[in-house]
Amino acid sequence: MKLAFVNTADIRDARKYSGTPFYMTKGFENHGVEFSAITQLKNQLPWQFKVKRLLGKISGLQESSRFNIHAAQNYAQQVSGQLQNLTVNAILAHIANPIAYLDCQQPIVLWTDALYAGLLGFIDNFSAHSAATVEHANTLTQAALSRVKLAIFSSDWAARSALELYGVSKEKVKVVPFGANFECSHTLFDVRALLRLRSPKLVKLLFLGKEWQRKGGDIVFKVAEALHKAGQPVCVDFVGCMPPQGVTVPDYINCHGFISKHDPIGLTKLSQLMREAHFLFVPSRAEAFGIVFCEANAFGLPCLTSPVGGIGTIIKDDINGMKFALDSDVDSYCDYIMGLMQNYSRYEELALSAFNEYQTRLNWQTSTGVVKQLIAEL
């Protein structure tokens, strides 16, 4: 099978889009798929856009170059020009923009984690978009969905947005979760060894998130405090963002700041933190998917989170973690954590089950194999 992977950025750069196109491509290549990359497209905008963007800064509304019909039409021209010199079976994209106005003979496949209308009013920075940007974004998204033969989504939540908000026919909508965005060769033997290193007395929580409010950093601090007051020894490794000014950091919380997994030292540190933790604790208030939960499961690390966005497709209660409602009180978290620590064999079963979810569902080898078969059936 030969595919053309269309993207505005370089799919060979693991830093782009959290590494999703990079690891997606590697997964397909492991199944013998040959790729032609049509990437690093130029974002060409009309002069009027710059004027609108300037006016938007005054009004407080944002004109987005990412969601612009003129730019999307130009992307299509660039892609079409490069396609003329290629022989491929299908076109694959993980964002809608470059395929929204693409006319070609080959079937087009979109495999993404979210659609614009599903993010509007859900992710905070979308709320500042101007009316023109909202119109452009929905128009080009609808255009992309009308062109694709397959609309594949990483979660049931995203798939519902296609069906309910854009009226996409059920026949072309599929759900295939993304995988972990790093190299992992852990075996069940390895994970059992990791479990023997985790203390059955001191519970270690790991927070990974660059946004304090959206990722639920405040909840993590409150739960850690409650565990400490209840007499449960606790240690939190807090990675990504720093607490806001005025937030007291107790001695049982270690704030590491941002650690990049794209440099060897950072990756080694993150891997160490995941090996040592009992739970990944990221109670997000909004999340399109949550690759980090797949990555945690690769270490036999169960996840404590919330049932928002695409998380429900990744985390299954008492199988690879637990989801708590956004209005859950602190005691709900504490009771769950302490219950497992006091019956440690149950925790170990949960950790092994989490690794099984990674091995069977939440890895790129499995996911790309499923999508390859879907494309072959077109």
Where are these regions (language model features)?
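Membrane-proximal helix-turn-helix segments that form the acceptor-binding/catalytic region
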Residues: 130-151
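Carbohydrate-associated surface elements
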Residues: 157, 179
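Conserved donor-binding/catalytic core segment of Leloir-type glycosyltransferases
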Residues: 193-215, 221-226, 236-237
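Nucleotide-activated donor-binding/catalytic signature segment of Leloir-type glycosyltransferases, i.e.
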Residues: 240-279
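Aromatic "clamp/platform" in nucleotide-sugar-dependent glycosyltransferases that forms part
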Residues: 285
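Short hydrophobic beta-strand element within catalytic cores of glycosyltransferases
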Residues: 302-305, 315
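A short, well-ordered alpha-helix in the C-terminal region of glycosyltransferases
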Residues: 339, 346-361, 370
